[in-house]
Amino acid sequence: MSDNFTESKNKIWHRRQLLQLGFSGAFMITTGTMWQMLNSKNYASVKIPPMKITASNGATNPMQVLRDFDYGTIKQENGRTVREFRLIAGTSTIQLNSAVSYNIWDLNGRIPGPTLRAKEGEKIRILFLNNAGHSHSLHFHGVHPAEMDGIKPIGNGKATIYEFDAEPYGVHLYHCHVAPVTRHVAKGLYGMFIIDPPKPRPPADEIVLIMSGYDVNDDNRNEYYAFNGVPHHYMHHPIQIYQNQLIRAYVLNIIEFDPAVTFHLHANFFDVYPSGMTMTPSVKTDVLTMGVAERHILEFAFKYPGKYMFHPHQDAIAESGCMGQFEVIAMKQT
């Protein structure tokens, strides 16, 4: 990393300057990153059903979002591990159903944005380029200096660098913080940020579930809702998991315009790790109330094969797109 790049973390960069430093579209996230954790020694015992990648629905593919963790690029600087991520805000169109399309802002061409993942204590560097036509920023939940809080707007065609230590461990999020924040978040500028604890959690099939809403007619009321970007996707394309295998779900509620929703799992109960900041669960339940930006780790395993629904227990929200199914399948004996 060149000195001028390292020392410029508080500056706003123009697109040409970032391109000169290697900030090009070539870094776009690939599905290969999703297997980095599962292929590690600690996760060797975890079996994942063959993934059925469905056709992309505009700006996102919920099946790829489900198990896709972006671990960034690891570097060593002055004896410290630096984990570098690159995010580009852009514009695209998502198909909410066969008749309704919606213009959104996206991050790295997808909604929700990439699920960033690091380990507690690492130094995090976020290279952010705004190509979305309006001023935007990235605000990360967690602990960091004020100048890294992502409040300052970054103009269209410009970029900036956020640097901070990964702390504390848990399930966090990032989102645009330019007013009106509700609109910028609701139109797609958000993602999950996982900081793993120093001691790894037990092996599990890990999935990401982000609840969101769409106000398509600007009346401050959502007409559509979704898990991982696309309404009803996991109802039409159930999430396959193996019978009796531990599932670790990182669940985030980012639904704007609704004060709170619940997460409900059919025919089962889950252990709750509040904000992912504990190593032992606080409660076991089958329905959990979550305010906007609230997130938790939920762990469970299914005893019986079959298809089981999950959804908010505000049924109007569920029936407007925020529902899905787990398809529990027996693991073949080898």
Where are the predicted features?
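Short, glycine/small-residue-enriched coil/turn segments at secondary-structure junctions
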Residues: 76-77, 111-124, 234-246
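N-terminal secretory signal peptides
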Residues: 1-17, 21-32
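Low-complexity, Pro/Ser/Thr- and charge-rich linker/hinge segments at domain boundaries
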Residues: 194-211, 330-334
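C-terminal segment of N-terminal export signals and the immediately downstream linker at the start
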Residues: 11, 32-82, 334
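Short amphipathic
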Residues: 83-90, 205-211
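Acidic-aromatic/histidine active-site loop/patch
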Residues: 208-243
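Histidine- and aromatic-enriched segments that form or immediately flank copper-ligand environments
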Residues: 84-193, 258-290, 311-326
